[in-house]
Amino acid sequence: MLLSVLLQAAAAGVGLSKLGAALGAGLAVIGAGIGIGKIGGSAMEGIARQPEASGDIRMNMIIAAALVEGVALLALVVCLLVLFL
């Protein structure tokens, strides 16, 4: 299936860089979603085990989620640059 997509892209004159940019953007979004899901799940588990530490756990969860989201945004920007330049 992937070979047929690559052959169609090559035949249509679309560069493989555009296909790679789309694939990279998709993988970046999927990775960020998985990462933020794991962060949230682990934070909820930690709060369930130690409710008195919920403030610290929540703060660390928000910082980690922001870092994961920042990396995903950077990956999307790089993919868009490859796509349009």
UniProtKB/Swiss-Prot annotation:
Q: Which InterPro entries match?
A: ATP_synth_csu_bac/chlpt, ATP_synth_F0_csu, ATP_synth_F0_csu_DDCD_BS, ATP_synth_F0_csu_sf, ATPase_proteolipid_c-like_dom, F/V-ATP_Csub_sf
Q: Which keywords, in A-to-Z order, does the entry hold?
A: ATP synthesis, Cell inner membrane, Cell membrane, CF(0), Hydrogen ion transport, Ion transport, Lipid-binding, Membrane, Transmembrane, Transmembrane helix, Transport
Q: Where in the cell is it found?
A: Cell inner membrane
Q: Which GO terms describe its molecular function?
A: lipid binding; proton-transporting ATP synthase activity, rotational mechanism
Recorded GO cellular component terms are: plasma membrane; proton-transporting ATP synthase complex; proton-transporting two-sector ATPase complex, proton-transporting domain
Site description Reversibly protonated during proton transport, residues in chain: 69
Query: What Pfam families does UniProt report for this protein, alphabetically?
Result: ATP-synt_C
Main site of residence?
Answer: membrane
Q: Where are the transmembrane segments?
A: 19-39, 62-82
Record bears the keyword Kinase: no
**What kind of membrane protein is this, topologically?**
Multi-pass membrane protein
Family from the record: Belongs to the ATPase C chain family.
> How is the subunit organization of this protein annotated in UniProt?
F-type ATPases have 2 components, F(1) - the catalytic core - and F(0) - the membrane proton channel. F(1) has five subunits: alpha(3), beta(3), gamma(1), delta(1), epsilon(1). F(0) has three main subunits: a(1), b(2) and c(10-14). The alpha and beta chains form an alternating ring which encloses part of the gamma chain. F(1) is attached to F(0) by a central stalk formed by the gamma and epsilon chains, while a peripheral stalk is formed by the delta and b chains.
Function as written in the Swiss-Prot or TrEMBL entry:
F(1)F(0) ATP synthase produces ATP from ADP in the presence of a proton or sodium gradient. F-type ATPases consist of two structural domains, F(1) containing the extramembraneous catalytic core and F(0) containing the membrane proton channel, linked together by a central stalk and a peripheral stalk. During catalysis, ATP synthesis in the catalytic domain of F(1) is coupled via a rotary mechanism of the central stalk subunits to proton translocation. Key component of the F(0) channel; it plays a direct role in translocation across the membrane. A homomeric c-ring of between 10-14 subunits forms the central stalk rotor element with the F(1) delta and epsilon subunits.
NCBIfam families membership: ATP_synt_c (TIGR01260)
What protein name is recorded for this chain? ATP synthase subunit c
Task: Supply the source organism for this entry.
Answer: Bacteroides fragilis (strain ATCC 25285 / DSM 2151 / CCUG 4856 / JCM 11019 / LMG 10263 / NCTC 9343 / Onslow / VPI 2553 / EN-2)
